[in-house]
């Protein structure tokens, strides 16, 4: 899997984790569900299903407007993060971290934005 370096550490993107999952389990399922959505805050759950068996879950929370990307895409960002975490819990792309490159990049951006305030 292709790695991205962020602040000196290697991370795997969610898209790379999904591609690897599809290679390993072409009939596997990645199911997502909104668990809560109110006042600009959203919580997603992602489930990884292999051969009809739930093998991993992941959750992610985002707040609308809490970062540059979340001003317009907090729903998509939360769903992507939940998928990345679920695939990580399944063991895909976790050589250096359970967090995906997407999550870490967003966190770094958020820290920079918070510092500007």
Regions found by a protein language model. Give the residues of each.
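Polyanion-binding surfaces on beta-sheet-dominated domains and ring/shell assemblies
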Residues: 1-117
């Amino acid at each position: 899997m292709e790695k991205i370096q962020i602040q000196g550490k290697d991370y795997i993107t969610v898209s790379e984790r999904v591609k690897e999952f599809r290679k390993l389990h072409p009939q596997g399922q990645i199911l997502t569900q909104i668990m809560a959505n109110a006042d600009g805050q959203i919580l997603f759950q992602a489930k990884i299903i292999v051969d009809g068996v739930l093998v991993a879950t992941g959750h992610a929370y985002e707040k609308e407007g809490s970062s540059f990307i979340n001003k317009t895409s907090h729903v998509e960002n939360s769903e992507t993060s939940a998928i990345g975490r679920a695939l990580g819990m399944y063991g895909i792309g976790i050589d250096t971290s359970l967090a995906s490159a997407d999550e870490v990049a967003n966190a770094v951006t958020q820290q920079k934005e918070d510092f500007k305030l």
